[in-house]
């Protein structure tokens, strides 16, 4: 740790480190080799003999740290005068005084503990202190940057004698929102290892509402720490940046590191997520009988908020962050010493809670549980994967957490869901990743009135009842949803050659420019790549688990265009990632998994390969089933001529709609043609109703035909292969859905969403698949390019290694700015009316006109050819025996395949329930 060298180096004493080397506990440097290990408590015990008269700092007090408190920086215009005022005349240089004008060596020996040095061993930031033979040189390095009244610094709100008359305002653009002009004063700040790090006092109005250290002491509640990162996330630790948790008198160990990634979410979505996180932390603090958690559990948890781009963050969300105390406007810098700032890092331990009244966000002071917040505001919009790089590579390396939890802004975790995820890792030492149940936010069931939301709710529920439990039973989950999942930090680390899960995961950030279409689409689902690489990590045996008791609620698209765009990325990413996993399944054999586990993985990947083939041929299979059912309705035993005519009409409209869907998908944005997509969804829904009627009608007719025979018996019904296959397929699908839902005690979606899902099934097969495969060239996440943010001031180094910064000083201004931030979300936001972009509107018009012309031309030509050649249904009068036989065989294969896959999923879900019951019994014996 680096300090300014203060006072005369000739100072000596009976317990001086120079006189008694055994008392020297400073961090090693080239001039001072590493000493034997000393227990941290001994460092505190040696305070008694020292001449320093300082109050003893507790573990939670921020002792000497490499940040500069902005309220203690002296006016550069009166620099010489203040130098004479504060520098004592005696050579003692303040020896024995209760401030920072003391020997930094002795202060270091008394308060700093070697095992928690934030700097690499052997990399001391300053040269060794001058020897006794060297003359004393009162250069600028000997002038203290900070001169507080105690070991913790002065109280920022009661310090008298601060003279602002000589301060000058910096002639720079006013930041937005504009603070009071007198708030902007120019101060000189010494860079720490070339990095700009500031301790900023929080507004007195905020401080008055929360417990904090009494003056003149300071703690994590009185100051917000700002760091201007000028490096890549992977270089954060190497550039000697650190975080507040490592700077306490006794550095805190992080058990749980939670990241909330956001883009431009409003204050309601952000507050919803943070309220859920706060409740989880409070839950863990209330577990008084736990071996790991308890009253002080919040000290083991750090909540990191990463915002993707300074120009993208919602101003009202930023105001909520300011209300929590973890953001202050006007502190950030554009450049430091000529280097562009890549991220603005704010740290604060908040005691302010949040609450929602409808859609209105309000603050709740004096929260029972403090929360350590880390807010990283990225300068540029670089997508979510870059936000995870800051979380894992930058902050994770400094804090070295045990478990990392990933949450998207807008996802609300259950009151104990984060704890339930953590418990899965605690019970299973080889659990490398876990996920919970993602629920659709239904607003007390009101959103179920939207068929699209109801369909997605059913899809999510069945995935959490059949798919996730099945995969968890085998030990490999194809995807841990990025909206709510957790990883063991050590399991993600790369090997000594830099190869591993994180290396593969972050590869997708920079490869789009020169990668092939296959690889680029694969990295649209980089979380799937991470899951596979984690399980197949060389010489390891990590597994993935599904935690049913951990839930996270999230919003889903409620309009067709947004839904299509979302599924385009999901389908393309999941399909190509599945191909990658199947092609690299051999990597599982280089792991340390048992032979039985590897065999289970092989069975699971075989199952996934079959599913992948069904997904590839889904559009063809659906058409064939449609053709067979409509053809069967045209026989004399069923509807006769009426059935034939209806079949021809539906087939024409089917092919025309399918063709139109291809045309729209290849050149039009769903946002530009919402009515066209809505019409297609309506047609496919009507078609599914028709097919459902056809299935039921044919089943009834088959039973009637068998009953009318003279030698009828109940067993003869099942001798009909077509009827038996249809019954088995329907029973294995729909009946097992009901049974599995009741086994998981979650059957309500079967009564509220089942019909909507059945009706919209053709939309999933045709519209979504066609749009996805027709846009495999689109490797974006559906967000536009980065908007340019307002330019911030820069911090350039002056002679002497100092920089000028704009800092807050006046209590009135701090309160005024704090009030202005609170007012931003104190009222309901005005209804946003998105004005269409003229360029996009014109482009949509041209593409829509092109699509309509091409569609009309192709349909008219198709009708002409069909009528002249008497094909495409006109020749369907008699069904040949061979054609009938082939159709029967094909239909039987499809129906029995569906039955087999459904039964396989049901078996896996039942096994998951058995294992879960056993785990609960184990947990009840050894509570954590």
Curated annotation (Swiss-Prot):
The keyword Glycosyltransferase is assigned to this record: yes
Catalytic activity as recorded in UniProt: [(1->4)-N-acetyl-beta-D-glucosaminyl](n) + UDP-N-acetyl-alpha-D-glucosamine = [(1->4)-N-acetyl-beta-D-glucosaminyl](n+1) + UDP + H(+)
Chief localization: membrane
Keywords associated with the record: Cell membrane, Cell wall biogenesis/degradation, Glycosyltransferase, Membrane, Transferase, Transmembrane, Transmembrane helix, Virulence
Record InterPro entries: Chitin_synth, Chitin_synth_fun, Chitin_synth_N, Nucleotide-diphossugar_trans
Record carries keyword Nucleus: no
Region: Disordered, residue numbers: 1-45, 110-179
Subcellular location(s) per record: Cell membrane
GO MF term set: chitin synthase activity
EC number: 2.4.1.16
Enzyme class: transferase
Induction (free text): The expression levels changes little with temperature change, regardless of whether the exposure to the higher temperature is for 3 h or 24 h.
CDD domains documented for this protein: Chitin_synth_C
Topology in membrane: Multi-pass membrane protein
Basic and acidic residues bias: start-end ranges: 130-140
Coiled-coil intervals, chain numbering: none
GO CC annotations, alphabetized: cell septum; plasma membrane
Biased composition (Polar residues): 17-28
Pfam families hit by this protein: Chitin_synth_1, Chitin_synth_1N
Region forming the signal peptide: none
One of the GO BP terms on file: cell wall organization
Similarity comment: family membership: Belongs to the chitin synthase family. Class I subfamily.
Name of the featured protein: Chitin synthase 2
Organism of provenance: Exophiala dermatitidis (Black yeast-like fungus)
Higher taxonomy: Eukaryota, Fungi, Dikarya, Ascomycota, Pezizomycotina
Recorded name of the encoding gene: CHS2
């Amino acid at each position: 740790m680096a300090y300014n060298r203060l006072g005369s180096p000739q100072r000596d004493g009976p317990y001086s480190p120079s006189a008694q080397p055994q008392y020297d506990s400073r961090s090693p440097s080239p001039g001072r080799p590493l000493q034997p290990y000393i227990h941290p408590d001994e460092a505190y015990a040696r305070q008694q003999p020292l001449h320093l008269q300082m109050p003893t700092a507790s573990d939670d007090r921020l002792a000497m740290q490499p940040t500069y408190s902005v309220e203690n920086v002296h006016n550069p215009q009166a620099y010489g005068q203040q130098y004479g005022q504060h520098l004592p005349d005696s050579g003692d240089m303040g020896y024995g005084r209760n401030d920072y004008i003391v020997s930094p060596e002795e202060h270091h020996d008394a308060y700093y503990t070697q095992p928690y040095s934030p700097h690499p061993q052997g990399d001391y930031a300053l040269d060794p202190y001058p020897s006794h033979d060297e003359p004393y040189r009162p250069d600028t390095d000997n002038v203290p940057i900070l001169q507080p009244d105690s070991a913790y610094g002065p109280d920022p709100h009661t310090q008298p004698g601060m003279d602002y008359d000589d301060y000058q305002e910096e002639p720079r653009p006013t930041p937005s929102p504009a603070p009071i002009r007198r708030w902007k004063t120019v101060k000189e700040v010494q860079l720490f290892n070339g990095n700009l790090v500031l301790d900023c006092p929080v507004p007195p109005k905020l401080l008055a509402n929360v417990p904090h250290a009494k003056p003149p002491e300071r703690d994590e509640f009185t100051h917000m720490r700002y760091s201007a990162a000028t490096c890549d996330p992977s270089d954060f630790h190497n550039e000697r940046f650190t975080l507040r948790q490592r700077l306490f008198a006794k550095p805190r160990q992080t058990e749980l590191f939670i990241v909330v990634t956001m883009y431009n979410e409003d204050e309601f979505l952000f507050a919803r997520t943070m309220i859920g996180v706060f409740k989880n932390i409070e839950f863990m603090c209330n577990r008084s009988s736990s071996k790991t958690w308890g009253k002080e559990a919040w000290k083991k948890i750090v909540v990191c908020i990463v915002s993707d781009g300074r120009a993208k963050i919602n101003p009202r969300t930023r105001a909520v962050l300011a209300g929590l105390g973890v953001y202050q406007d006007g502190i950030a810098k554009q450049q430091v010493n000529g280097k562009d700032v890549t991220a603005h890092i704010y740290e604060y331990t908040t005691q302010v809670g949040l609450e929602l009244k409808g859609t209105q966000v309000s603050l709740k002071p004096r929260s029972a549980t403090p929360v350590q917040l880390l807010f990283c505001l990225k300068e540029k919009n670089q997508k979510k994967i870059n936000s995870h790089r800051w979380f894992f590579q930058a902050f994770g390396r400094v804090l070295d957490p045990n478990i990392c939890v990933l949450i998207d802004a807008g996802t609300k975790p259950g009151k104990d869901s984060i704890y339930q995820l953590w418990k899965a890792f605690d019970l299973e030492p080889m659990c490398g990743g876990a996920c919970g149940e993602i629920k659709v936010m239904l607003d007390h069931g009101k959103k179920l009135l939207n068929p699209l939301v109801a369909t997605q709710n059913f899809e999510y529920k069945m995935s959490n009842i059949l798919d996730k439990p099945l995969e968890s039973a085998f030990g490999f989950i194809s995807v841990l949803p990025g909206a709510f999942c957790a990883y063991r930090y050590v399991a993600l680390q790369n090997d000594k050659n830099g190869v591993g899960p994180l290396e593969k995961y972050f590869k997708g950030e920079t490869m789009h420019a020169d990668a092939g279409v296959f690889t680029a689409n694969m990295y649209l689902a980089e979380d799937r790549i991470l899951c596979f690489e984690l399980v197949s990590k060389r010489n390891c045996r990590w597994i993935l688990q599904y935690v049913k008791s951990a839930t996270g609620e999230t919003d889903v698209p409620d309009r067709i265009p947004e839904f299509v765009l979302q599924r385009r990325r999901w389908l393309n990413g999941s399909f190509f990632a599945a191909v990658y996993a199947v092609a690299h399944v051999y990597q599982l054999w280089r792991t340390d998994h048992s032979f039985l586990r590897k065999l289970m993985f092989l069975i699971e990947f075989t199952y996934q390969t079959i599913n992948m083939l069904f997904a590839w041929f889904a559009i063809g299979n659906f058409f064939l089933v449609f053709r067979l059912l409509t053809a069967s309705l045209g026989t004399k035993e069923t509807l006769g001529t009426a059935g034939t005519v209806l079949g021809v009409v539906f087939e024409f409209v089917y092919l025309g709609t399918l063709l139109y869907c291809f045309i729209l998908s290849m050149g039009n944005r769903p946002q530009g043609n919402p009515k066209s997509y809505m019409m297609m969804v309506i047609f496919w829904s009507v078609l599914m109703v028709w097919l459902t009627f056809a299935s039921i009608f044919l089943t009834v007719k088959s039973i009637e035909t068998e009953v009318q025979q003279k030698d009828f018996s109940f067993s003869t019904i099942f001798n009909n292969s077509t009827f038996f296959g249809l019954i088995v397929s329907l029973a294995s699908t729909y009946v097992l859905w009901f049974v599995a839902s009741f086994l998981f005690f979650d059957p309500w979606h079967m009564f509220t969403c089942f019909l909507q899902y059945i009706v919209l099934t053709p939309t999933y097969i045709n519209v979504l698949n066609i749009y996805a495969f027709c846009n495999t060239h689109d490797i974006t996440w559906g967000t536009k390019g980065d908007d340019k943010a307002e330019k911030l001031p820069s911090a350039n180094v002056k002679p002497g290694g100092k920089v000028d910064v704009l800092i807050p000083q006046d209590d009135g201004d701090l309160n005024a700015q704090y009030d202005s931030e609170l007012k931003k979300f104190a009222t309901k936001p005005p209804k946003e009316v998105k004005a269409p972009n003229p360029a996009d509107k014109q482009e949509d018009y041209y593409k829509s006109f092109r699509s309509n012309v091409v569609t009309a031309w192709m349909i008219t030509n198709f009708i002409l050819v069909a009528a002249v050649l008497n094909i495409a249904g006109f020749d369907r009068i008699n069904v040949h025996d061979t054609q009938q036989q082939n159709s029967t065989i094909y239909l039987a294969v499809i129906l029995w395949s569906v039955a087999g896959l459904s039964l396989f999923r049901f078996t896996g879900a039942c096994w998951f329930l058995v294992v879960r019951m056993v785990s609960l019994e184990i947990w009840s014996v050894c509570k954590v």
